[in-house]
Amino acid sequence: MNRGYMGKILWVDLTAKEFREETVPGEIYEKYLSGTGLAAWLLSERIPAGADPLGPENVLGFVSGLLTGTGSLFTGRWMVVGKSPLTGGWGDANCGGTLSPAIKRCGFDGIFFTGVSEKPVYLLIDHGRPELRDAGHLWGKDTAETEEYLIAEAGGHARVAVIGPAGENLSLISGICNDRGRIAARSGLGAVMGSKRLKALVLNGKKRIPVYQRAEVQRLSRQCNKWVQLQPPFIPGPMAAYVGTLMRVLPTQMAMEGMVYKILLKKWGTVSMNQMSVEIGDAPVMNWKGSNVDWGIGKSLSVNPDAFKSREKVKYHCYSCPLGCGGVCTTKGPYGEVHKPEYESVMALGGLCMNGDLESIFTMNEMLNRAGMDTISAGGTLAFAMECYEQGILTREDLDGLDLTWGNAAAMITLVEKMIKREGVGDLLADGSRAAARKIGKGAEDYVMHAGGQELPMHDGRNDPGFNVHYSVEATPGRHTIGAQLYYEMFQLWKRVQGLPKPPLVYHKNRKYVANEEKAVMAAACSRFMNVANGAGLCMFGLFLGAARIPSFEWLNAATGWRKSPEEYMAIGAAIQTLKQRFNIKHGVDPLSFQAVDRVVGRPPQNRGANKGRTMDIEKMRSDYWRQCGWDPKTGRPEGEIAPSPPRPSP
């Protein structure tokens, strides 16, 4: 009997236009859960070594979470998986919205695509019946137009995942969109979808999702929701920056309590951290060479939390989320009502490029969402091009006449449009900064801020070394949604998992930069826990409530009927981590090549600002982490088998 999971996946052969359902044994869910765990098990053997990420041998998968649809909270995440054309290794992108339960209500835990369609198509699953339909009339349309059309055509109740022009044009920094602005952006998987000439998935199902103890799941959810709804008064948005200033100047630091971050998220969303992050040295500035000195409180005032709150027409909640950190905002630009930009997007298109023009940030964010292009990588690529222009590596002639100086919002908007269309210099930049630098030469690679080919997110590891560790060791490099010292403090896993260290409540800041076994244990615990979360479909923001308040492990047991301990679930997370690492080794990716670049780890250290004088011993931190994973501490290669290989699909 299936419990929590549907027990089946759907294979779609785009070349042959054939469908095949596959039953997944129950013991596989017990070993790897669902979500990216199930996907890692499936794709480990089914994508052959050397497969072209943009070729027919690559597999593109859409997976839901084991807890999605069971009545548990914060379980609306869906994931896209495949071999990444950006990094050459394991690729997955995680997204909110409303698609995740739609996958399961069609009767599947995942939908996987092989081959390449001769012409553009979209997949429609209507009450269990899969069908490939012509998408020629939709090719070239943006994600919002396409989604609106397909929902109307399906009767108004379907959920849609769709690529825009960036994915169609095989941009290596393109993603996959749903709900008009929630995007599975990282790893370049929009290009994989475009290479298969697959425009969209349209899902319309009503299958009941089985739950072992539905009443218990609901009881746990009610208990958890009491913590979510606590919302004491907080300071005005512009004052948050001064809290950051105080945190920066004090020699000591207090361990972060997730309930505080919950208050910020519930009131403002992720933009609550915009100015504060600049002040404490968390938000990178001027392509990672600047600091709060260059983009201080005065310059960043335009992106203070209340600037977004004042435009918010309605809050946006992902499926099963009581927090509602998203929003729909009104703008003065051409798009009218748009999704509120997230922190990552604001800072990538803002401080990273020294741009304080709020209206331009709204405009570029919506342009990129409609095109289906990653705002983090797009912002990182813009900042790279700006520094190349500053250094004389790119000239105004190279940039099609654009005066790409720091903070030139009009030039940024024009360049974003060119990148989306692959027009002029936009064609050079559409695949991200590393690919562009390799074509430019002339030392341009010195200004690419990446790990393993993926532009880095808006969290500076010189402030929190845990970010640099995870940027450098995850199977999907340059990732900020797995772990950091800050995350470990908020997860509070030591309250539920035996043997994990409890950080002190107050500690000297210098303690963060000491590479030792305790830091490695914390980092490995974050990886394992988030692998469990991504197998369950849990949102990281919900997990910040702390392990004693959000019943992740209890939800899993109640939904499935299992009786696993927190330690057993963490072991599952470790097994998933190793599967993904093995995938990279199989596909010729050297784990050493994922190390974040020198500037990002403080080589040389900055001479002013919040992160002045800080350098990470990233090699030791990485080696210590690999040792905690049971891998070779010098090479990052796993040793020994951890699971039987899944069978290859029948021809």
Residue ranges and their predicted role:
Residues 1-94, 98-648:
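Intrinsically disordered, low-complexity segments enriched in small residues
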